[in-house]
Regions:
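Metalloprotease/metallohydrolase-associated module, dominated by Zn2+-dependent proteases
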Residues: 4-36, 63-179
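Active-site alpha-helix of zinc metalloproteases
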Residues: 43-48, 66
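Active-site recognition of the HExxH zinc-binding catalytic motif
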Residues: 47-59, 70
Length: 179
């Protein structure tokens, strides 16, 4: 007959295995997202709401910051969640949130890459200001659009890869500690 301790350890090992599988599945999904950043994903709807809220949040800081605030807030919000989990000592949850951060950066890179051609549909229609066209024009960096978009995409991809490794390592580490 198994003791209560043996049963609990078995459940903990199962939980760790589930965590590894979840990290792997998230990794496959988000690595696919990194390879296809132009595709729309469900999480992009969340990112869009956060992006638009960022314009309102940064509005008191002037026009440039209000416009930059959309993309900034879209990246800051997942960072806040990641920081919260890290502060609480939950590295695995932090790793999962880093997948979101990486995908959000990919989303921002697509918007930045569109700053010259301006073909993405904007919420306000044709009369809307294209955030990245406005920002890069004001910073005299429109000629650097491709480089800037690539750098943001690379950072997003690296964040996703880091999240994958960190999530698996933390799940595996907790599995070893439970045996």
């Amino acid at each position: 007959m198994r003791t209560e301790t043996q049963i609990l350890k078995g459940e903990e090992r199962t939980t760790s295995r589930v965590k590894i599988v979840v990290a792997l599945l998230a990794g496959v999904y988000f690595v696919w997202a990194a390879a296809h950043p132009d595709d729309w994903r469900l999480i992009d709807g969340v990112n869009l709401v956060i992006h638009e809220a960022g314009h309102l949040f940064f509005r008191p800081l002037g026009e440039f910051m209000m416009i930059a605030g959309g993309s900034l807030f879209q990246v800051i919000v997942p960072m806040i969640f990641a920081g919260y989990f890290l502060y609480r000592g939950n590295q695995y949850s932090c790793a999962l949130v880093l997948f979101w951060l990486g995908e959000s950066l990919l989303n921002v890179s697509v918007y930045a890459a569109d700053s010259i051609v301006m073909q993405l549909p904007l919420l306000g229609g044709n009369d809307s200001i294209h955030d990245w066209n406005y920002m890069l024009d004001h910073l005299d960096l429109l000629r650097q659009t491709a480089t800037i978009a690539f750098a943001i995409r690379a950072l997003g991809t690296l964040t996703i890869l880091f999240a994958l490794v960190w999530g698996i390592v933390n799940a595996a580490r907790s599995s070893r500690n439970e045996t």
